[in-house]
Amino acid sequence: MRKWILTRILPTLLYRSCFHLVCLVGTISLACNDMSPEQTATSVNCSSPERHTRSYDYMEGGDIRVRRLFCRTQWYLRIDKRGKVKGTQEMKNSYNIMEIRTVAVGIVAIKGVESEYYLAMNKEGKLYAKKECNEDCNFKELILENHYNTYASAKWTHSGGEMFVALNQKGIPVKGKKTKKEQKTAHFLPMAIT
């Protein structure tokens, strides 16, 4: 007797479950038609993409951040009034205040606020400063898991490897050819101006 009841009821239960599922999906797609994927995920209580990837709105273009770039070697990146790039340990030095402008997704240009020079890297990996922004001034900004950022030339590479902005233990710029993402000389904290 039980076998007959299950055989008769099971197709009805499956049909109703599928019907409810189709109605639910259809309702969600109609309600979320004008929403971005992030908004849709949030509205249907799914895990949002931010939960799995790090979302940084400022990396999407047009944003300007004013920061001091503090290297893990204990030096602030500085561009002086003559356009010389080096490190300083003076926190309150006006030449270490940088304007970090987003050029494209993950690409930034770094400009000294006081000196009005842009940070640039040539094909040999040497850091220098320019009054006018060009492709040499574009850097790929990467946020590492240790909360430091790296800045690699968006234009130049060396033997297939990226060339990074880096300051050695004496605050002297390291040529990009000698840098790697894992080196602490290439790790910077963008510190808010206080």
Swiss-Prot record:
GO CC annotation: what is one? Golgi apparatus
Where is the secretion signal located?
Answer: 1-31
**GO-annotated biological processes:** actin cytoskeleton organization; branching involved in salivary gland morphogenesis; endothelial cell proliferation; epithelial cell proliferation; fibroblast growth factor receptor signaling pathway; hair follicle morphogenesis; mesenchymal cell proliferation; myoblast proliferation
The residues that carry sugar chains are 45
Q: Please indicate which superkingdom the organism of origin belongs to.
A: Eukaryota
Instruction: Give the subcellular location.
Output: Secreted
Q: A single Pfam family, by name?
A: FGF
**Chief subcellular site?**
secreted
User: Which GO terms label this protein's molecular function in UniProt?
Assistant: chemoattractant activity; growth factor activity; heparin binding
Q: Give the family from UniProt.
A: Belongs to the heparin-binding growth factors family.
What binding partners and quaternary form does the record give? Interacts with FGFBP1. Interacts with FGFR2. Affinity between fibroblast growth factors (FGFs) and their receptors is increased by heparan sulfate glycosaminoglycans that function as coreceptors.
Q: What is this protein called?
A: Fibroblast growth factor 7
Source organism (scientific name): Mus musculus
Q: What is the lineage of its organism?
A: Eukaryota, Metazoa, Chordata, Craniata, Vertebrata
State which gene encodes it. Fgf7
